[in-house]
């Protein structure tokens, strides 16, 4: 989860988020090198006497500044396309959870179970217990097994919403009349917080998401107690 005054990304909890963080560092390094080169050239122009001001044609230079940006764009595009493919690929999910956005709460349905469904509302500030997080706690958490691929089907009952959990690298739009899907895989147990990430009305800020990732045995016990 996020911490006060945090400047970086949240700690990665899923393979997808780890790949996204690596891609972020890779792209940022390229941007830093390009910025350094541009600043160096500008400093040279400002501190040295200008030469070749009347040059009308320089094919060698034009070739370089055409090919070099193309190579840089390819170096950025290839890992990006790889991650996009990984995010869309779902191989044999062990569980499917249907998520519906409402104004202003989420509802969840475990489609592999006959009667396992519930609504998830934010806990008001006045009802919080010591140690709980303001605007992030819910009355019903989404309990899921860790280290297993889980398919999330995401849609909306009314307006546009967006189901997002940053530490898992998840952000999927909830669109009325359309079913989007995302893959959830957690490397370790814990509580992972998210929020609606699409402006959806006056209480948009009061639609938190809480995933509780537990070992498979604990999940089986929880699901048996809920049915």
Curated annotation (Swiss-Prot):
Swiss-Prot/TrEMBL cofactor(s): Cu cation
Enzyme class: translocase
Subcellular location, record wording: Mitochondrion inner membrane
Pfam families in the cross-refs: COX2 (PF00116), COX2_TM (PF02790)
NCBIfam families xref list: CoxB
Record text on cofactor binding: Binds a dinuclear copper A center per subunit.
Record's bilayer topology term: Multi-pass membrane protein
Mitochondrial intermembrane membrane side: 1-14, 88-227
Single GO biological process annotation from the record: ATP synthesis coupled electron transport
One Gene Ontology MF term: cytochrome-c oxidase activity
InterPro entries cross-referenced by the UniProt entry: CcO_II, CcO_II-like_C, CcO_II_C, Copper_CuA, Cupredoxin, Cyt_c_oxidase_su2, Cyt_c_oxidase_su2_TM_dom, Cyt_c_oxidase_su2_TM_sf
Family under the similarity heading: Belongs to the cytochrome c oxidase subunit 2 family.
Name of this chain's protein: Cytochrome c oxidase subunit 2
Membrane-crossing residue ranges in chain numbering: 15-45, 60-87
UniProt keywords, alphabetically: Copper, Electron transport, Magnesium, Membrane, Metal-binding, Mitochondrion, Mitochondrion inner membrane, Respiratory chain, Translocase, Transmembrane, Transmembrane helix, Transport
Subunit structure as annotated in this protein's UniProt entry: Component of the cytochrome c oxidase (complex IV, CIV), a multisubunit enzyme composed of 14 subunits. The complex is composed of a catalytic core of 3 subunits MT-CO1, MT-CO2 and MT-CO3, encoded in the mitochondrial DNA, and 11 supernumerary subunits COX4I, COX5A, COX5B, COX6A, COX6B, COX6C, COX7A, COX7B, COX7C, COX8 and NDUFA4, which are encoded in the nuclear genome.
Function statement: Component of the cytochrome c oxidase, the last enzyme in the mitochondrial electron transport chain which drives oxidative phosphorylation. The respiratory chain contains 3 multisubunit complexes succinate dehydrogenase (complex II, CII), ubiquinol-cytochrome c oxidoreductase (cytochrome b-c1 complex, complex III, CIII) and cytochrome c oxidase (complex IV, CIV), that cooperate to transfer electrons derived from NADH and succinate to molecular oxygen, creating an electrochemical gradient over the inner membrane that drives transmembrane transport and the ATP synthase.
Residues holding Cu cation A2: 196, 198, 200, 204
Binding locations of Cu cation A1: 161, 196, 200, 207
EC number: 7.1.1.9
